[in-house]
Amino acid sequence: GKLCLSEMLFIMVLFHASPYKDFKHFYIHGVEGEYRQLFAEVPCYARFVQTMGRLLLPFALLAHCLRGEATGVYFADSSKLAVCHNRRISSNRVFAGLAKRGKTSMGWFYGFKLHIVINHKAEIMAVRITPGNTDDRKPVPAMAKGLLGKLFADKGYISKTLFDQLWKNGLQLITGIRRTMKNYLLPWLDKILLRKRFIIETVLDTLKSTLGLEHSRHRSPVNAFVHIFSCIVAYGFKTTKPKLNTAIQMWDYP
């Protein structure tokens, strides 16, 4: 059996929207089972996985097309994408030369980082995938290209160089301050929005917990990136997204 490109894309998005946590079980019991009537022909699981690589570019383009609305209020953050358990780092061959050891507040991991920028409606504006040891601030200029307004982030994004670079392009970086730093005055609405950074943590939690973004069963780097981008596309199609207090959205801001 053969599937056209759109059917393969649909299957990947359907997986993220389904209750299945494992793609193999989803394909065998879902695609070849309860959803079988949706497709004229269905190849076996092994054949589908062999041809998944061709979906990478279409999914990357789809993710770009589902980009959120330019609202002037944005949030930036990153999250780890571990590709194996720490005990198996030395034996991992699938991502050799690609994945790197990184560290978060929860400890060390081996894999990649997903960097993300969203607007205040929790719509994804930009994503970047980097090795796990990449500084969170490094991808921000490329991700923020074309964005105007204010970008809220945590203390890990503090950088005068980054602030100046974004400021020249019409985007103000607003972060919390470290204990050793001198306090500075912020407009009250900026202070409120800085405290609302949990919205991007909610988006990352939705990607990981609900849509199954992170797992350690990948057998191919290309298929791993297909999985990541299909997850981002599935999120873009979600009709219900986290929201900030509507009273804040009513302000003509920034």
What are these regions (language model features)?
Residues 1-254:
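Short alpha-helical elements
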